[in-house]
């Protein structure tokens, strides 16, 4: 596509371009704007500068005519004969700060707009903001501010540029991309920031009919579980099927066990086949050898199954892509929701439905956790139980062959028992759908992402391809959509539990660590609780005379477990305190073991211990 054609295309979507004029080979050149640049437009000349086919700073029509003649001569001297099919373009030369806007059809997030410093500095500094083509103005602004160069829009050095103009420009790009669905990649570089606003001076666009997105299928409600079948329930205590069957005994609905050997398990009939089940089932858990799963799903369709949890491994994770694809094709054909394969299972607190082979020590609560790693999930469940954190839902997605993160977030948004969502993410199948779900979510979404190194990228013809498919894009897009990215796995259960915390109190035996912790608390938008005169009076009776009478409550370095206990018994009664940190550093007299035992007690307020040291603690 020639520069003239690109300008016409962009102008149709109201994307500003410089004044320009297309000039025929046999046409006398004339322009009513100067200075101009003149370039050849011909498929015969790819690298214009090498052919001497670009002339700059032309200030009159006479000079324009001379420049055209010189370009023709230069090109012909290179052995290329021009004719009436070739054209020229005269473009008004414009000055301004060089910026970059582009679009990539990312394998995960779909069509995504990129913004950064223009010219050759783009790839050098990789200072890039990422913006979804579906983002609203607020999300666009957050995406733009992901690049440091966006400070230009904050009246930098009194230049008077507003970020509103950049947001308007991005919205025009969004409209252009949606109106031209075959656009697969685009570079606008540079886009000049001028007194008149942003102007796209140079553009390259790649088209691909395969870039058109397909619609997602309408699903049944995965969390609507009334009748459950456990395929592979086993009386062998060493098998996964035994653990799942035992965990499922608390379910408030109907649970059926299936095992080809028959018999009984936990006082319930073991049906020899799916066909023997006394009724239809909406949900099936499958824990049998992988070679039997497809035929089992076939049987389950005759029981009108809507949801299938494939616990069994032996698919993509060991290289059997074909076997996994057969599962995908089958469940899509029959509109079955599939979790897995190769997963830990599923839990729903409201109905005491535990279809996992993890611990049965699970408390009902308001946090939903979705994880691609069963091992990480099992560890989080154990840690949560120890800290009395309950779950509304737990979903181990395993290979995530069918239902993905976006669909689960969308479904959890409609679950009243769920108040917050935490995700352990190794990779995403459909980032675009996830962003849509995140925008609509009325519940906070916390994410820990592993595999942060650059992932595989499709070959690209532009700057854009070198800046996509990485953790920075993942982070930029998700944070702009309102998600909270974490740098600690255990924060997936602790951060949501502390979401409503406002006032924090610190009990410590050392000033330095408490000072560091104070900064940490304040930087995260929490308040350090201010002790009242009455609070101080009560603490005075329990602490040495020289305690600082402020929060952090420094109980002095010689504090032992008895002083920690008296202090905690007092501060847990302070009505406005939401959370208590307890800092312990090793002094000669510090009885660390007794203090640790003390901190494990059931206190009225959440207590988070911080043991600073090594061997002695």
What are these regions (language model features)?
Residues 1-617:
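Catalytic-core regions of core metabolic enzymes
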């Amino acid at each position: 596509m020639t520069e003239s054609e690109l300008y016409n295309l962009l102008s149709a979507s109201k994307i500003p371009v410089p004044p320009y004029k297309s000039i025929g080979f046999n046409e006398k050149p004339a322009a009513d704007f100067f200075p101009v640049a003149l370039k050849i437009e011909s498929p015969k000349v790819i690298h214009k500068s090498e052919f001497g086919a670009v002339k700059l700073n032309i200030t009159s029509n006479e000079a324009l005519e001379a420049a055209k003649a010189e370009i023709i001569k230069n090109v012909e001297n290179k052995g290329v004969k021009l004719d009436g099919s070739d054209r020229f373009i005269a473009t008004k030369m414009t000055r301004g700060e060089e910026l970059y806007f582009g679009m990539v059809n990312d394998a995960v997030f779909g069509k995504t707009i990129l913004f950064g410093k223009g010219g050759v500095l783009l790839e050098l500094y990789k200072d890039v903001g990422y913006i979804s083509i579906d983002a609203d103005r607020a999300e666009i602004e957050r995406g733009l501010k992901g690049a440091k160069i966006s400070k230009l829009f904050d009246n930098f050095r009194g230049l008077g540029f507003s970020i509103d103009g950049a947001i308007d420009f991005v919205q025009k790009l969004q409209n252009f991309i949606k109106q031209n669905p075959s656009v697969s990649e685009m570079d606008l570089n540079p886009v000049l920031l001028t007194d008149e606003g942003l102007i796209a001076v140079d553009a390259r666009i790649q088209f691909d009919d395969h870039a058109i997105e397909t619609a997602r299928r309408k699903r049944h409600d995965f969390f609507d579980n009334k009748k459950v079948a456990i395929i592979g329930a086993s009386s062998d205590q060493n098998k996964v099927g035994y653990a799942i069957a035992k965990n499922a005994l608390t379910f408030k609905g109907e649970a059926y066990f299936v095992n080809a050997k028959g018999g009984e398990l936990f006082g319930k009939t073991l049906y020899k086949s799916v066909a023997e089940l006394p009724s239809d089932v909406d949900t099936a858990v499958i824990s049998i050898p992988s070679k039997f799963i497809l035929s089992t799903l076939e049987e389950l369709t005759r029981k009108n199954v809507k949801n299938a949890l494939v616990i069994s491994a032996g698919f993509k994770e060991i290289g059997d892509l074909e076997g996994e694809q057969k599962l995908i094709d089958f469940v899509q054909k029959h509109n079955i929701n599939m979790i897995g394969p190769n997963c830990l299972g599923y839990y729903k607190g409201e109905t005491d439905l535990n279809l996992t082979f993890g611990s049965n020590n699970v408390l009902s609560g308001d946090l939903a956790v979705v994880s691609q790693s069963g091992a990480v999930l099992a560890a989080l469940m154990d840690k949560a139980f120890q800290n009395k954190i309950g779950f509304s839902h737990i979903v181990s997605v395993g290979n995530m062959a069918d239902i993905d993160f976006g669909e689960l977030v969308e479904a959890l948004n409609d679950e009243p028992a769920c108040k917050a969502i935490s995700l352990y993410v190794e990779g995403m199948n459909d980032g675009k759908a996830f962003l849509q779900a995140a925008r609509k979510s009325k519940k906070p979404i916390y994410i820990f992402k592993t595999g942060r190194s650059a992932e595989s990228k499709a070959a690209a013809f532009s700057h854009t391809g070198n800046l996509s498919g990485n953790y920075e894009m993942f982070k930029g897009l998700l944070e702009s959509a309102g998600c909270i990215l974490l740098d600690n796995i255990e924060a997936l259960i602790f951060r949501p539990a502390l979401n409503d915390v406002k006032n924090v109190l610190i009990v410590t035996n050392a000033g330095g660590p408490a000072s560091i912790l104070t900064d940490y608390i304040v930087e995260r938008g929490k308040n350090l609780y201010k002790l009242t005169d009455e609070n101080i009076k009560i603490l005075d009776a329990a602490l040495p005379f020289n305690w600082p009478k402020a929060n952090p409550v420094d109980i002095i370095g010689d504090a032992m477990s008895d002083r920690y206990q008296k202090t905690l018994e007092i501060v847990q009664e302070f009505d406005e305190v939401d959370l208590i940190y307890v800092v312990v550093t090793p002094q000669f007299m510090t009885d660390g073991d007794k203090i640790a035992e003390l901190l494990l007690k059931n206190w009225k307020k959440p207590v988070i211990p911080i043991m600073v040291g090594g061997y002695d603690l």
